[in-house]
Amino acid sequence: MGRKKIQISRILDQRNRQVTFTKRKFGLMKKAYELSVLCDCEIALIIFNSANRLFQYASTDMDRVLLKYTEYSEPHESRTNTDILETLKRRGIGLDGPELEPDEGPEEPGEKFRRLAGEGGDPALPRPRLYPAAPAMPSPDVVYGALPPPGCDPSGLGEALPAQSRPSPFRPAAPKAGPPGLVHPLFSPSHLTSKTPPPLYLPTEGRRSDLPGGLAGPRGGLNTSRSLYSGLQNPCSTATPGPPLGSFPFLPGGPPVGAEAWARRVPQPAAPPRRPPQSASSLSASLRPPGAPATFLRPSPIPCSSPGPWQSLCGLGPPCAGCPWPTAGPGRRSPGGTSPERSPGTARARGDPTSLQASSEKTQQ
């Protein structure tokens, strides 16, 4: 909060005047003490209040300071209340304004040189000057720019190109002129363009150990750049698995690289078991019921390989290609579903093993 500012004029109230005198007298002596210690000087204060009471303060010995004062005959600085009022008016500070130290207010050129000369300093020497801080550098997001990811492109290697190979749309502007004390800028414009964006993550080494020696370097760089920048270029590229490594045309001749490992990882479907070929006699024997004579043969209920609209079972229609069963014209079934009369020749032709084998060989030829 600080001390309340009061008007610098005579205090009419006796009690308030006494309290103010006690406080400010102690403050004056405290300031004299600080000045004597900091600046190594001798100070003597002689105060008479309104009741003609004497109050004195001496940094060392009052008699010695007074003796030195009476014997001093050279020109010296001497001020009164009138001089203090004129100094405050020149600085634009009223009597009721804030209390400032002499070095805190504005100074005239003459007073500045006199003060420097009194302190032993050389006015001709340059004084250090303070400049404002340099403007902050732009953030990496503004320098490199955050581009929105394009649409999904599952076509292949379109997203494998790194972002550094494309020309950057950002061009750093020329730096503004700094304060007059700085001749060169703190950072050169080339420093902004030479920086590369930090990697998103470090890829695992040794994944492609089965690559040839000639393709390990560029192929590894291609995979690294794809893993680093695939999230920025194409967010949907990771959802579609790529083809195996051996299917690329730029690999050397011979067995494709990684084909054996790919075949070991992917299980092959088992082939169905094949049945041994059977002859016509064994087929007819397997279809003959037990206890039936060799001349008896039941029509096969197995559908024909290429049935027509008028037949449903082998032996009941015209012979088809590859069918081992002989049929006779008079014994086939009519389209209407009625069974015609069978002649003895039809039963004999169907039941004769010799004719059955001959027709089977003829069909196979």
UniProtKB/Swiss-Prot annotation:
Keyword line: Activator, DNA-binding, Nucleus, Transcription, Transcription regulation
GO biological process: cell differentiation; heart development; muscle organ development; positive regulation of transcription by RNA polymerase II
Keyword Iron-sulfur: no
Protein name: Myocyte-specific enhancer factor 2B
Annotated DNA-binding residue span(s): 58-86
Cited InterPro entries: MEF2-like_N (IPR033896), TF_MADSbox (IPR002100), TF_MADSbox_sf (IPR036879)
PROSITE patterns: MADS_BOX_1, MADS_BOX_2
Organism of derivation: Homo sapiens
This protein's encoding gene: MEF2B
Region spans: Disordered: 94-124, 142-309, 321-365
Stored Gene3D superfamilies: Transcription factor, MADS-box
Domain called MADS-box: residue spans: 3-57
Cleaved signal peptide residues: none
Low complexity bias: start-end ranges: 277-289, 326-346
GO cellular component, one term: cell junction
